[in-house]
Amino acid sequence: AWKSERKLRISYERRKSSKALNYKVYEFKKEGFININDIKIKYFEVDHKPVPYAYGFSFFSKKKKLTISGDTRPCESLMINAQNSDVLLHEVFIEYEINQISGLRSKKTLHNVKEYHTPSNLVGKVAKLSNCKKLVLTHFVPTRFNISKLKKIVRKDFGKDPIIGNDLLTINI
């Protein structure tokens, strides 16, 4: 299945190089559980069409729940599984910060990438509807953006500031 997805990504996203897509993949069912010591992990399919096999994850300890959206547009599966999470870690496509670049990033490429991710004007709604306590944003597209503006957009729907994720960030749950 991975070969067909790899081919689809290259064609759909109009990538110049496919070197970053060469890695080993292990496939599993659409939904299920994994237990690691005292942590129960639920994996569930999210909507990243046309690319198949995208998953979110909920981690359960005795008293806490952390949900990771995975690469997805807003979808029912995420909303169900993220309910009442102490932390929702969610990707975000910051559409107002990304522009066409001649020969590199076409208008169609931007449209196609936005189509299967969660735009900044919707991620706060997802967090609010999931009733999460904290929202941590990550997997930023583009990687450089106005943090204050993003927080303001998300706060409008979520009702509080999101946490802007970064490498090695520690969050008390």
PLM feature spans:
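Binuclear metal-dependent hydrolase catalytic cores
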Residues: 1-67, 75, 149-173
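Conserved acidic
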Residues: 71
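Cap/insert and terminal regions of metallo-dependent hydrolase folds
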Residues: 56, 63-65, 74-168
